[in-house]
């Protein structure tokens, strides 16, 4: 990986970063262990929802992506929160290396991974052409020996993915095909997370991609206010939560963010109101922030918590016992 040099000296690994990420300064809080994500029996089982409260996590994107910078970005946010994230969100291309050094670092600190695994053409998958590769990925996940959330081809309802997904029926067939290969490989440590966009429930596009109750462990949505004007978290997620309420499944908000364009004080108010929505809906069992500014998106599509007003509101949420249920296992 460019910008990352690992030197082993006296059994210690020293990471030299040539493209350093300018992370926020530590708050001085004591760093505590990650609140543990529960499993049914042992660490090699799939993660299960907490009986009370909700897991809290994030994708923390550095300005310049390297493995070292990703680790530093997560570490910096955790220093400010005062404890490790229960869930660390990572993104994985269809045939990318796995696990990465950052994946292993997050697992080693006691966090659980939410792996957003990108797809390929759904009809290619169901043809069997990629079966060997899918088996390889299944063995990689199994070999971790730790619980993970696995989110295959998230936001599949987006119009710009239609040439790859083709239709809801094609997507469901590909999902079932992948799950069958994982089951045959004996992968028991992955909870399968189905995660379209929240917008897909207001425009009616998402439901056609649902694989069915027997094939999904967690129902999820990525929730961002639409471009142009102000939209609350509640108005963004309400259609999704209404749909999810008809299913006996734990709910995850896999990504959410408040645009930088709103300004510091409105962002803080938006976050505090979002917390109230989550706490009031006991079906929501995991909440993950998208702490990044994607390239070329402008202020309306940037969500990183760089201003102290919004960051303070965010930290007050992350610090609440409701979002640290693992401590009460």
Walk through the language-model features, giving the residues of each:
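C-terminal region of N-terminal signal peptides and the immediate post-cleavage residues
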Residues: 10-39
């Amino acid at each position: 990986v460019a910008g990352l040099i690992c030197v082993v000296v006296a059994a210690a690994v020293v990471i030299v970063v040539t493209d350093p990420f300018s992370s926020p300064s530590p708050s001085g809080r004591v760093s505590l262990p990650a609140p543990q994500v529960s499993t049914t029996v042992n660490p090699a089982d799939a993660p299960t929802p907490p009986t009370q409260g909700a897991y809290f996590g994030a994708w923390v994107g550095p300005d310049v992506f390297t493995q070292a910078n990703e680790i530093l970005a997560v570490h910096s946010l955790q220093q400010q929160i005062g404890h490790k994230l229960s869930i660390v969100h990572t993104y994985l291309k269809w045939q990318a290396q796995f696990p990465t050094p950052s994946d292993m670092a997050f697992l080693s600190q006691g966090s659980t991974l939410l792996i957003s695994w990108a797809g390929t053409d759904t009809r290619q998958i169901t043809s069997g052409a990629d079966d060997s590769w899918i088996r390889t990925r299944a063995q990689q996940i199994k070999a971790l020996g730790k619980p993970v959330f696995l989110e295959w081809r998230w936001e599949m309802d987006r119009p710009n993915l239609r040439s790859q997904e083709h239709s809801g029926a094609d997507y469901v067939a590909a999902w079932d095909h992948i799950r069958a290969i994982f089951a045959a490989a004996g992968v028991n440590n992955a909870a399968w997370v189905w995660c379209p966009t929240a917008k897909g429930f207001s425009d009616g596009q998402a439901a056609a991609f649902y694989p069915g109750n027997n094939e999904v462990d967690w129902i999820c949505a990525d929730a961002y206010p639409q471009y142009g004007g102000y939209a609350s978290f509640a108005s963004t997620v309400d259609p999704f939560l209404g749909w999810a309420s008809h299913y006996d499944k734990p709910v995850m908000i896999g990504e959410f963010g408040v645009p930088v364009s709103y300004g510091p004080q409105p962002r803080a108010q938006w976050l505090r109101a979002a917390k109230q929505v989550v706490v009031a809906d006991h079906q929501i069992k995991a909440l993950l922030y998208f702490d990044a500014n994607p390239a070329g998106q402008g202020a309306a599509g940037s969500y990183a918590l760089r201003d102290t007003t919004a960051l303070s509101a965010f930290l007050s949420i992350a610090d609440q016992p409701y979002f640290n249920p693992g401590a009460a296992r």
